[in-house]
Curated annotation (Swiss-Prot):
It is an enzyme of class 2 (transferase). Pathway: Cofactor biosynthesis; coenzyme A biosynthesis; CoA from (R)-pantothenate: step 4/5. GO terms for biological process: coenzyme A biosynthetic process. Belongs to the bacterial CoaD family. This is Phosphopantetheine adenylyltransferase. The keyword Ubl conjugation does not apply. Homohexamer. It catalyses: (R)-4'-phosphopantetheine + ATP + H(+) = 3'-dephospho-CoA + diphosphate. HAMAP family: PPAT_bact. The record marks H18 as: Transition state stabilizer. InterPro entries: Cyt_trans-like, PPAT, Rossmann-like_a/b/a_fold. Keywords: ATP-binding, Coenzyme A biosynthesis, Cytoplasm, Magnesium, Nucleotide-binding, Nucleotidyltransferase, Transferase. Substrate binds at S10, K42, T74, R88.
């Protein structure tokens, strides 16, 4: 049986913190699925299709990583994908409470799945998608905060 992990999120946009976590977990699994959440509750800078494309370009160096879009419960997607592990990143202590609640909810819904919490590397712990959007909107430098392909896409989006 293949070891498959799912890393769900909105990834609007994918940041270097996300890329770092994916780089670090990809050697641990046969397949890592970056699952782009389709949410009508959030105002997004990029459509889910644009996010999927940007992530694919940013992670093209990782051959065991694929990107997919899903609009339902992560555990339902995991059943279809035959995945065993949900990966979540932790930047700060404040993330822990939310992630613990979600992990326990997922365990209630699907007792066979595990949640792997991965601490952000120190050089990326301060980066968030929301913060990156603020920097972009206010004309700040995005280099090092997001992959180069995302820098270009964000600059083009803001110019419009």
């Amino acid at each position: 049986m293949s070891k498959i992990a799912v890393y769900p999120g909105s990834f609007d946009p994918i940041t270097m913190g996300h890329v770092d976590i994916i780089n670090r977990i990809s050697p641990l699994y046969d397949e890592v699925i970056v699952l782009v959440a389709q949410s009508s509750q959030k105002q997004s800078m990029f459509s889910v299709e644009e996010r999927k494309t940007l992530i694919e370009k940013a992670l093209s160096h990782l051959k065991n990583v694929k990107v997919d879009i899903f609009g339902g419960l992560t555990v339902e997607y995991m059943k279809k994908a035959k995945a065993q592990v949900i990966v979540r990143g932790l930047r700060a202590v404040s993330d822990f409470e939310y992630e613990m609640t979600m992990a326990n909810m997922n365990r209630k819904l699907a007792p066979d799945f595990e949640t792997l919490l991965v601490f952000a590397s120190p050089e990326f712990y301060y980066i968030s998608s929301r913060g990156v959007k603020e920097v972009a909107i206010n004309g700040g430098a995005l280099k090092g905060l997001v992959p180069d392909v995302v820098v270009e896409a964000m600059e083009n989006k803001i110019r419009k």
